[in-house]
A protein has these predicted regions:
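Substrate-binding/charge-relay-adjacent region of secreted/lumenal peptidase catalytic domains
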Residues: 1-195
């Protein structure tokens, strides 16, 4: 499987950047140690990871990505697969692609910017031939408020519960295509903001 090849042998850098304890910097070495990532360099050039952004607000800067890669002793590798519109750089999207680059060095990093929300992204994704191996979504919203203002009305005036069920079915289809879908637990942790 493509995912088994994702993290082949990790080779520690011969000249890691030296920073002092307590100086506030968190470099790649800290993340790898903190999360016990022992194989972070992708050897298979076909492996791809993708930051998914919504509501047409995601944007990245390849220059910022290259700076991050250089400061962390990584090989510079631009994002060439951008689906949708790359708006001006946004902090969340920048963080997403930079973290992917750090924990999966040398992977083909994508950015996918959808104009709407979960369901429309899923339909667009499932109707696309050339897709990434791994999706990472760091967006979230209360389950009971999926059809509330700010997100737009749900298709066919569904309730939030119906919408979630439909979205879940579409994401199962992504898994059946062999795509790994990783979703953050949110800024407030797994229980969310509204429990």
């Amino acid at each position: 499987s493509a995912h088994a090849d994702m993290f082949a042998a990790y080779t520690p850098r011969s000249n890691p950047k030296s920073v002092g304890a307590g100086d506030g910097y968190v470099g790649r070495e800290v993340l790898l140690k903190l999360y016990n990532i022992t194989h972070s360099r992708v050897e298979n050039p076909e492996i791809s990871v993708c930051a998914v952004e919504y509501q047409n607000v995601g944007g990245i800067s390849n220059q910022d990505l290259e700076t991050q890669q250089s400061l962390n002793g990584e090989v510079k590798k631009d994002i060439v697969h951008i689906k949708g519109t790359n708006q001006s750089p946004m902090l969340e999207a920048q963080l997403d692609v930079q973290m992917m680059s750090q924990v999966a060095e040398n992977a083909d990093v994508w950015m996918w910017s959808g104009t709407q929300w979960l369901y429309s992204f899923a339909v667009d994704f499932l109707n696309t031939t050339d897709i990434p191996d791994v999706l990472s979504m760091s967006w979230g919203w209360s389950a009971r408020d999926q059809c509330s203002s700010g997100l737009g009305t749900c298709p066919g005036n569904m309730t939030s519960s119906q919408y979630l069920h439909r979205v879940n079915m579409e994401y199962v289809k992504m898994g059946l295509r062999g795509v790994t879908v990783a979703v953050s637990s949110g800024d407030a942790g797994a229980p969310g903001r509204t429990n």
